[in-house]
Amino acid sequence: MIDEKLNTVEEAKVEEPKIARFTEFETKYNSDITNLSQFKSIVETIPDLLDFTYAEGPDTYLTKPDGSFGRYRVAKYPSDTKYAQWTLKFKPVGAKNNISRLEYNWRVDGTPEQEILDGATAMGFTFNFKITKQCHIYRFKDATLVFYSVREEGITKEDYYVEIEITEETVHELTEDQAWEVIRKYEKILEPVGVNAQKRLRKSLFEMYKKDVK
């Protein structure tokens, strides 16, 4: 009798690939200033909170014809940080949403703003728009939860959003399914303030506020 085990062909398990390094994996949701207090109350009771930061300041967006864009960010508060950052973002070819994008960040503290903007212009970038954000940032090991307002330059009306972002430093250790597990975990926690899968925004802030530049 031939051992059935010898006739068994084991199918090789196809391992799901990890997310690429420098990937920004996040979801956003519309909110309202009336949700801020409850958001903070909920998040501050979640175990393993690493730290909280409040920051505000302008984000200047610049675009290129190929669809990529740059963002120059300056943190005005806390005032002693003198935080400045230049970011390049790329939307993957064929992507249907902005949940996962390539993002490269450089700290540029101490570099004059005009030097950054002139350098961006020399690389083919064109100014598109400027917004000011006020952010309540809660950092956990696996994700960062943020409630923030957005105000366009020259406009008094503010928009409000909640954001769940997978930790950038370790996102490449996860598969996409594992990243979604983290997103869904925090969506369930934040459901009382209107955060759920049905309310995920398909557009990024860039797509919501960008101007048609000719």
Predicted regions and their residues:
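N-terminal strand-loop-strand beta-hairpin
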Residues: I2-A143, V195-K214
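Domain-wide signal for the mature, well-folded portions of proteins, strongly enriched
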Residues: P47-F52, E113-L117, E165-E168, T175-K185
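Conserved, surface-exposed functional patches that form binding/active-site neighborhoods
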Residues: T126-E173
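Mixed-charge, glycine-accented linear interaction segment located at domain edges/termini
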Residues: E169-E207
